[in-house]
Amino acid sequence: DNFDGVYTACAKTMTEVTFMRGSKYVFCETREAFQSARNYLENGNYVLYTGTPCEIAGLISYLGKNYEKLITCDFVCHGANSVAAYQSWLLEFTKGQTVKKLDFRDKSVFKWSTTATAYLENGNIIRENHENCYCCFDWTC
């Protein structure tokens, strides 16, 4: 609901997992996520923690011991913008309008495009195609 950054969330149902889908490209604010994961583990629950490789390393370091019921899943990190850079981009991209939904990679335009799409509260849609340096064939840049 709040587009000021990306935050770690806990889901107990598959419906709740749906809200976590999609590319983020911004450093994640873990807030109390590590502590929550530890609490769930200490209470004998399974925990699946998904994040960037550095977030997973941070969690394991924070926990300080192995937990049999901890499952971690990291993904290839293409680099993440700082929260300040993201907020600046979002303000410029939406011209300060209230965002209802944000897709960094809108697959409705082209299946794996680099089109960012903001669905605004007033019903308008803003799209912006941005460079994808990870699929660039210009090795001189």
Model-derived regions, located:
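Iron-sulfur-associated redox domains of electron-transfer enzymes in respiratory
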Residues: 1-141
